[in-house]
Amino acid sequence: MTFLSKLVQAGTMFSMLALSASATSATLETSVFNPQEKSLFPVSSVLITGPTEAILVDAQFQRNDAQSVVELIRKSGKKLTTIYISHGDPDYYFGLDVITAAYPHAKVVSSAKTQEYIIASMVPKKSYWGPILKENAPQELVVPEVLKGDTLMVDGEKVKIVGLDGHDPKHTFVWIPSSKTMLGGVVVFGNMHVFLADTQTPESRHLWYKTLDVIEQLHPTTVIPGHIVGNKPLTIQAVNFTRQYIQNFETAAKASSNSSELIAKMQASYPNIGGDNILVLSAKVIMGEMKWGQ
């Protein structure tokens, strides 16, 4: 059986991978919408489909991108049963009002930690980002229900949420056991500067390393980064890239006296990756030049 993983850029779907699996493998497929650098955050929304059903992981940041996700779901021809929000940052859930308007019967769920984070921060986040997003800001905010257990189902196949009871329940990831596919969410980046403004302490970054170790121990065949720029293969290399980037950033920060020096060092180390705006923000926060809670 062939397992297809597709990346959708600016509403156009193209095949990234065609991986051969055994006859006992699942019928589940993944399709990924990522607006790339046409939007503020190149965040991945992943549609997991079986023969008749589908679940969506993450709902985009901007209304126009959420509408592209709606079109992706419609083109699949599957029944959307569930929308899972993997993290509480607004680029994962601001698009929910668009998607739930199109699919009002789909259940919206998240982990308890994610729901708690969204409830505590969604109003100030909308106040901060609304003037920036303008017409692409959410018209209303949707709060997920808490997922019972750690398993979602698609046509009888399991999709697992890994890390709910682990070392860092706020940062989990999605795992499709039958196809050994991992959806990285907030913890895996690909070919772009890693967002570090939310992990301002060595302890928080140590937990991040541990999560990357857990992913590696699963030996995934396919890794879909939560944020990615370009057409890099969807492999374990994204996990390696993320870990090495964080290590290099920490080393560069210790050797820098201000954010400008840190930015210059990281751009010299990574001259051909995306997300310069993310680097600037991360550097200012880590060097203590900017407070970050948005």
Model-predicted segments: where are they?
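N-terminal signal peptide c-region/cleavage motif recognized by signal peptidases
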Residues: 18-22
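Accessory terminal helices/loops
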Residues: 217-222, 229-294
